[in-house]
Amino acid sequence: MKKEFTLEIHSDNNFSVLNRIVNVLNRRRVRIKKLIAHENEDDFRRGIAVLLLHTTPDLMEKVKHQLEKLIEVEQATFCEGCDLYFELSEKNNKQVA
């Protein structure tokens, strides 16, 4: 049964990384509901992407491992539900404002 998952990805901050992440999700037919991407406040060369996804737990585990194989990705973590997504998006909005 499909559920909502929050996926947080820490990676290099360059142009092709976000495209590669989206390609991995599209190949697996994972639905992206929301996406936030921003650079790390301490190091502009590092970036963070937070995605709200709609998929199965088994497929989410496979996507996580596939994303961690990308050279630019440092780590990928996910949790069930959308609470973490909204918490991280509020934190990001406060930093921007």
PLM features: residue spans?
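A conserved regulatory-domain signal marking ACT and ACT-like small-molecule sensing domains
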Residues: M1-A97
